[in-house]
Curated annotation (Swiss-Prot):
Signal peptide: none
Residue stretches in coiled coil: none
Provenance organism: Xenopus laevis
Disulfide-bond pairs as recorded: none
Protein name: DNA replication complex GINS protein SLD5
Compartments in which it is found: Nucleus; Chromosome; Cytoplasm
Biological process annotations from GO: DNA replication; DNA-templated DNA replication; double-strand break repair via break-induced replication
Pfam families: Sld5 (PF05916), SLD5_C (PF16922)
One GO CC annotation: nucleus
Subunit structure: Component of the GINS complex which is a heterotetramer of gins1/psf1, gins2/psf2, gins3/psf3 and gins4/sld5. Component of the CMG helicase complex, composed of the mcm2-7 complex, the GINS complex and cdc45.
Function comment: Required for initiation of chromosomal DNA replication. Core component of CDC45-MCM-GINS (CMG) helicase, the molecular machine that unwinds template DNA during replication, and around which the replisome is built.
Keywords: Chromosome, Cytoplasm, DNA replication, Nucleus
Location, primary (coarse class): nucleus
């Protein structure tokens, strides 16, 4: 794992970021934990996924060239399995959220402004659209066609629950943050501000720090 890998920003060669394999795996781990603990679907990290898959292929090729009986082979096998687990868990977490919140995710992607990063990879977008079509077809064939005419339509945006952005999450601060406004827990309390030092850990409502997760200033744990 000595080579460096290029990770571009939204496909622009000018914004290419060169990472060591260790830095790439750290990015995958952070993306995995953020996705695992965030209540909503986060920005797609498809380029990280592609680079990690490329790195896994490179590591496996190195294993085939290694001498039989070399103790390092066992450690490399363990590292490959660890990376595979993080990668598959990351993709599985995203797929489960797409299945659970698909109408809201598609609506958000549809209304995404120009220049905003996509929350779905092309493959995920195709899956979400197909999942929505299949859900509508199933509802019509199994239930809606047996209903009175005025009840034969369903608004999936209203029927499918939204992600609970008010759920609480644990986080670790990567970049110092000042005057973060925290919403009150009860009507008797008032809004207040907190400062978060680098390395500090907090339990806080996700909605409050969602922009900080997106920017990479904090990471979920």
């Amino acid at each position: 794992m000595e080579d460096e890998l290029a990770l571009s920003d939204q496909g622009s060669d000018e914004d290419e970021e060169v990472l060591t394999p260790a830095e790439l795996i750290n990015k995958l781990e952070e993306a995995w934990l953020n996705e695992k603990f965030a209540p909503e679907l986060l920005e797609s990290k498809s380029e990280v996924v592609e680079c990690v898959m490329e790195q896994l292929n490179h590591m496996e090729q190195n294993l085939h060239r290694a001498k039989p009986g070399d103790l390092k082979i066992s450690f490399h096998h363990m590292e490959i399995e660890r990376i595979r687990y993080m990668l598959s868990s990351y993709l599985r977490s995203r797929m489960l959220k797409i299945e659970k919140f698909f109408p809201h995710i598609l609506e958000k992607e549809k209304s995404r402004g120009e220049g905003e990063p996509p929350h779905l990879s092309p493959e995920e977008f195709a899956f979400a659209k197909e999942y929505m079509t299949n859900t509508e077809t199933l509802l019509k064939s199994v239930a809606l066609r047996h209903m009175p005419p005025n009840l034969q339509t369903v608004d999936l945006l209203k029927s499918v629950p939204k992600p609970n952005l008010d759920s609480f999450v644990f986080l670790r601060v990567k970049e110092e943050q000042n005057n973060i406004l925290v919403e009150p827990e009860t009507d008797e309390q008032s809004e207040y501000a907190i400062d978060m030092e680098v390395g500090s850990q907090h339990l806080i409502r996700y909605r409050t720090i969602a922009p900080l997760v997106a920017s990479g200033a904090v990471k979920l744990i």
